[in-house]
């Protein structure tokens, strides 16, 4: 346990996990263990949130393989509008949803995506990241992760809602996240305390989902090797 807010105390562990020579799932697992060590009460609250979401079937009705991936038209970190139709005209697209620039698991995920972006682009595919944070935070997120792909702002989680990915964190997690030092209302520009379930959809040039990873346990993400394989298969 630590007297520092969790957000601050976790930075050293985040940097360690980011720099590990390991798979994304191993890095995420190491981070989850660090969270539990630093704040057992926070980790226990997360476990309760995940159990509630799993019991309610959160994310199960998000687009399935073979179904159309609904279009979007969202601003990137520089304010430019980016559309799914525009992206998929150049090849398969990995559409990744993140809780925000503040989420250490999302940060690890985005760093891992940035590390393989050149390989993905060489094979004629693309990546786009979507989160509910305002533009200034999208810019910070992109800079920190060294990503060259667009970081899009889904204001008020409208697109996530259309994909049945939106969840309310609940009163307990509101308190825990705030006490940890993360100011979600400021980041999003609203007080709804709604977050997207982290998810990855591989969309083909025909507009249909070729692969998906949707898990209400935000500590888990699509493995990078699996994403690369799915993008190859989508051609």
Tell me the role of every PLM-derived stretch.
Residues 1-90, 122, 192-235:
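Non-globular targeting/processing and membrane-anchoring segments
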Residues 84-113:
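Short active-site neighborhood of thiol/selenol oxidoreductases, capturing the structured segment around
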Residues 103, 135, 221:
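Loop/helix-junction capping segments adjacent to catalytic residues or to phosphate/diphosphate-binding pockets
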Residues 109-162:
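Structural microenvironment flanking redox-active thiols in thiol-disulfide oxidoreductases
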Residues 154-220:
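Thiol/selenol-based redox catalytic cores and closely related redox-interacting motifs
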């Amino acid at each position: 346990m630590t007297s520092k807010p969790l957000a601050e105390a976790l930075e050293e562990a985040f940097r360690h996990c980011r720099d590990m020579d390991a798979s994304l799932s191993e890095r995420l697992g190491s981070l989850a263990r660090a969270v539990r060590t630093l704040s057992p009460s926070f980790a226990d609250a997360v476990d309760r949130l995940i159990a509630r979401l799993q019991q309610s079937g959160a994310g199960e009705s998000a687009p399935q393989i073979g179904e159309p991936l609904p279009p979007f038209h969202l601003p990137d970190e520089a304010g430019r509008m980016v559309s799914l139709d525009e992206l998929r005209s150049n090849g398969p697209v990995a559409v990744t949803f993140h809780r925000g620039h503040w989420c250490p698991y999302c940060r690890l995920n985005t760093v891992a995506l940035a590390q393989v972006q050149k390989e993905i682009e060489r094979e004629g595919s693309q990546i786009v990241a979507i989160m509910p944070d305002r533009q200034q935070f999208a810019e910070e997120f992109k800079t920190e992760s060294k990503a060259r792909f667009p970081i899009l702002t889904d204001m008020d989680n409208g697109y996530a809602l259309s994909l049945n990915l939106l969840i309310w964190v609940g009163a307990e997690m509101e308190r825990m996240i705030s006490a940890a030092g993360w100011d979600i209302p400021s980041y999003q520009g609203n007080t709804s305390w709604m977050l997207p379930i982290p998810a990855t959809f591989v969309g083909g040039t025909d507009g249909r989902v070729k692969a998906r990873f949707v898990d209400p346990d935000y500590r888990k993400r699509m493995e990078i090797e699996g994403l690369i394989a799915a993008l190859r298969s989508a051609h």
